[in-house]
């Protein structure tokens, strides 16, 4: 997973949570927000921003689980699926993903209606996945999440505030009216873990 400058909360939200009105510590708070965002990515083993666009899609390579499907990283929109059945790194078998009858189906099928990405592609048309060689499937498109979930935004605000106040709390305890008392340590705040538990998945699958 590549590092990103995308963050999941704002400077204003964290300052409001900490009841800070001046701008003296803005740079330090912004650094805490960035660190908290990447901690969330690592904990969930996925990211909540988007990589790639329709004009400049991102590329991933996968090893099929079976002839019938591949498990993928989070996909918002697919722009190309190509396979390399001869294992010559040509990826010249281009699947139909635009005009019915399609060669693919996406799962979980209802995820877009819930604001979630797809994580599996099924072969339902003219081809099967060449599963006997590794990295024989090339997928291009937009990866990540359609929008940052509210729970992730809130988790990032809490975690960023905790990281910022840590340097000011030599006894390991800090707090504010909004955040309450927070015990500071090297792991995510328990409230943050609770907010994020629904979003955790296995380690990224792209090669």
Residue ranges, per PLM feature:
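Divalent metal-cofactor coordination and adjacent catalytic microenvironments
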Residues: 1-207
């Amino acid at each position: 997973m590549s590092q990103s400058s995308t963050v999941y909360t704002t400077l204003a939200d964290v300052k409001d949570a900490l009841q800070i009105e001046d701008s003296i510590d803005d740079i330090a708070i912004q650094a805490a927000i960035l660190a908290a965002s990447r901690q969330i990515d690592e904990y969930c083993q996925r990211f909540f921003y988007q990589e790639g666009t329709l004009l400049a899609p991102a590329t991933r390579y996968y090893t099929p689980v079976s002839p019938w499907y591949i498990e993928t990283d989070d996909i918002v929109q697919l722009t190309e699926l190509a396979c390399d059945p001869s294992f010559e790194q040509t990826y010249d078998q281009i699947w139909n993903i635009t005009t019915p009858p399609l060669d693919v189906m996406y799962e979980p099928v209802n995820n877009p209606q819930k604001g979630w990405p797809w994580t599996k592609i099924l072969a339902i048309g003219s081809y099967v996945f060449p599963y006997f060689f590794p990295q024989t499937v090339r997928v291009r498109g937009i990866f990540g999440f359609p929008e940052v979930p509210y729970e992730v935004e809130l988790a990032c605000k809490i975690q960023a505030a905790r990281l910022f106040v840590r340097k000011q709390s030599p006894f390991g305890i800090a707090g504010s009216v909004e955040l309450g008392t927070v015990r500071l340590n090297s792991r995510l705040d328990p409230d943050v873990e609770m907010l994020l538990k629904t979003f955790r998945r296995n380690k990224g699958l792209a090669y």
